[in-house]
């Protein structure tokens, strides 16, 4: 049986730190971020289905979100100000991401490749799936800003403002619901979020 480096590469997601140009109270890695994006994307899909007449496969969307930054094990996490410095850099980075996604897919064993390819290759996602994962990705970055600001780290003030604009551009009914129901708790301390439901 031929060996595959697929999961050895994926396990390195935990070694790639996000927000590398900014001082962090708590460092966040790509593995942690991917789990949170998967949970939030699943919630957004479930909210859309339950409250707003959606027909999404919430479990598939959670899987897509789990793998949405997987190619960064080959490219690293390029800081947002660099990635979107101008349209040419953004376009070139998208091309690099596509190459990295394909390289990662090619590492999977032949008999499993058709399972992992549609999870890693964003071109295999529907527009609606892409939109939900992008919403969740932006929401999680926004939540990171709230956590850092709550811890007294003003370094994330401008990032929060930028992400508020991004969230407004990606706005949806399910995102509005999530923002109204779940986000306010991120401004509270552990004691405050625990007092209503003590063990």
Curated annotation (Swiss-Prot):
Its cofactor is a divalent metal cation. The record marks 18 as: Appears to be important in orienting the phosphate for catalysis. Its EC number is 3.1.3.89. It catalyses: a 2'-deoxyribonucleoside 5'-phosphate + H2O = a 2'-deoxyribonucleoside + phosphate. Coiled coil: none annotated. It comes from the Bacteria. It is found in: Cytoplasm. GO terms for cellular component: cytoplasm. PANTHER family: 5'-DEOXYNUCLEOTIDASE HDDC2 (PTHR11845:SF13). This is 5'-deoxynucleotidase YfbR. It comes from Salmonella typhimurium (strain LT2 / SGSC1412 / ATCC 700720). The gene is yfbR.
């Amino acid at each position: 049986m031929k060996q595959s480096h697929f999961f050895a590469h994926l396990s390195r997601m935990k070694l790639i730190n996000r927000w590398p140009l900014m001082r962090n109270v708590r460092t966040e890695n790509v593995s942690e971020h991917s789990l949170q994006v998967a949970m939030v994307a699943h919630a957004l899909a479930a909210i859309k289905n339950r409250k707003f007449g959606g027909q999404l496969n919430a479990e598939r969307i959670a899987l897509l979100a789990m793998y949405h930054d997987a190619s960064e094990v080959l490219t690293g996490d390029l800081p947002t100000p660099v990635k979107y410095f101008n349209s040419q850099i953004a376009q070139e980075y998208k091309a690099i991401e596509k190459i990295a996604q394909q390289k990662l897919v090619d590492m999977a064993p032949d008999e499993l490749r058709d399972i992992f390819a549609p999870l890693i290759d964003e071109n295999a996602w529907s527009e609606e799936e892409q939109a939900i994962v992008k919403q969740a990705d932006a929401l999680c970055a926004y939540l990171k800003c709230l956590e850092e600001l709550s811890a007294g780290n003003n370094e994330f003030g401008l990032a929060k403002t930028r992400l508020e604009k991004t969230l407004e551009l990606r706005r949806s009914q399910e995102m509005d619901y999530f923002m109204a129901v779940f986000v306010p708790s991120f401004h509270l301390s552990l004691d405050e979020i625990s007092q209503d439901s003590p063990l």
